[in-house]
Amino acid sequence: MQILLANPRGFCAGVDRAISIVENALAIYGAPIYVRHEVVHNRYVVDSLRERGAIFIEQISEVPDGAILIFSAHGVSQAVRNEAKSRDLTVFDATCPLVTKVHMEVARASRRGEESILIGHAGHPEVEGTMGQYSNPEGGMYLVESPDDVWKLTVKNEEKLSFMTQTTLSVDDTSDVIDALRKRFPKIVGPRKDDICYATTNRQEAVRALAEQAEVVLVVGSKNSSNSNRLAELAQRMGKRAFLIDDAKDIQEEWVKEVKCVGVTAGASAPDILVQNVVARLQQLGGGEAIPLEGREENIVFEVPKELRVDIREVD
């Protein structure tokens, strides 16, 4: 059985930065460090940080005075940010800079009183944070997930309208929603390029190439990871059996029985150790050496806040 590895796969710059912020805060300040929401959507990462003293909470009221608080990579609303400011807390922001860019687009529209439409998944923390940047009662902020939502939507002023997107969406699905928005509201204004981030786009492109060759595709990622779910859906849409797995223990032998080629990829919040474990398990089931496919090279790095720029090896 041939094993193919998608390229790129796994950690993106925003996830790397967010995890480093929590790790460095633990090294400098010691446990406990409070993190609002899972810093990234990966069970292995969250469990390992929890073991080292990170406490994951959903409400600022759960954080004691004088504590260290970190906002997750998904970003937070202005209301959450203001609540944290009103408390005696030291706050570090692990929001992905590409999410912050979308926040700034929404804030600009809010200041101008223009209505805004966000393409995204209801209930996702990134969507909640992005919607929470809009505060102008003269305008309005709306969420759509599908072309059907667009056709049902009514706004106050079609002449002054803009749209933004969640950063971890399906490129193909989002294109369909944008097409519907432009037909429904001909004067709507959007970003020069949709807000789907480079890592999401690259990983979807890579899984498309992977699924062209593999009979079965394994996506390493947690069930609550938006970008990981989109990878599995894309492979399935291409007619391949695809499974979203947290780790090697989730692999069922019958998935790869009599399969000649299996493909492996990982969502942007899944560490490479999990991919290595999956490859090792596939090799136990008869797989050969893992062969990486060619793909886009990624060299983007996002710096951590200057207060946390320390070599953690220097910290006792």
Curated annotation (Swiss-Prot):
Gene of origin?
Answer: ispH
- Quick one: which residues bind isopentenyl diphosphate? 41, 74, 124, 225-227, 269
What's a single GO MF annotation on this record?
A: metal ion binding
Q: What residues make up the catalytic site? A: 126 (proton donor)
Q: What is this protein called?
A: 4-hydroxy-3-methylbut-2-enyl diphosphate reductase
What does the UniProt record note about how this protein's activity is regulated? Answer: Addition of Ca(2+), Mg(2+), Mn(2+), Ni(2+), Co(2+) or Fe(2+) decreases the catalytic activity. Addition of Zn(2+) results in complete loss of activity. Is potently inhibited by substrate analogs in which the hydroxy group in HMBPP is replaced by an amino or thiol group.
Q: What is its EC number?
A: 1.17.7.4
Give the source species: Escherichia coli (strain K12)
Binding, (2E)-4-hydroxy-3-methylbut-2-enyl diphosphate: 41, 74, 124, 167, 225-227, 269
Q: Please write the reaction equations for the catalytic activity of this protein.
A: isopentenyl diphosphate + 2 oxidized [2Fe-2S]-[ferredoxin] + H2O = (2E)-4-hydroxy-3-methylbut-2-enyl diphosphate + 2 reduced [2Fe-2S]-[ferredoxin] + 2 H(+); dimethylallyl diphosphate + 2 oxidized [2Fe-2S]-[ferredoxin] + H2O = (2E)-4-hydroxy-3-methylbut-2-enyl diphosphate + 2 reduced [2Fe-2S]-[ferredoxin] + 2 H(+)
Q: Which UniProt keywords apply?
A: 4Fe-4S, Iron, Iron-sulfur, Isoprene biosynthesis, Metal-binding, Oxidoreductase
Pathway note: Isoprenoid biosynthesis; dimethylallyl diphosphate biosynthesis; dimethylallyl diphosphate from (2E)-4-hydroxy-3-methylbutenyl diphosphate: step 1/1; Isoprenoid biosynthesis; isopentenyl diphosphate biosynthesis via DXP pathway; isopentenyl diphosphate from 1-deoxy-D-xylulose 5-phosphate: step 6/6
Q: Which residues bind [4Fe-4S] cluster?
A: 12, 96, 197
Q: What is the effect of changing residue 12 to S?
A: Loss of catalytic activity
Changing residue 124 to N has the effect of: Loss of catalytic activity
**Per the entry, which co-factors are needed?**
[4Fe-4S] cluster
Residue pairs linked by disulfide bridges in the UniProt entry? none
CDD domains, sorted:
lytB_ispH (cd13944)
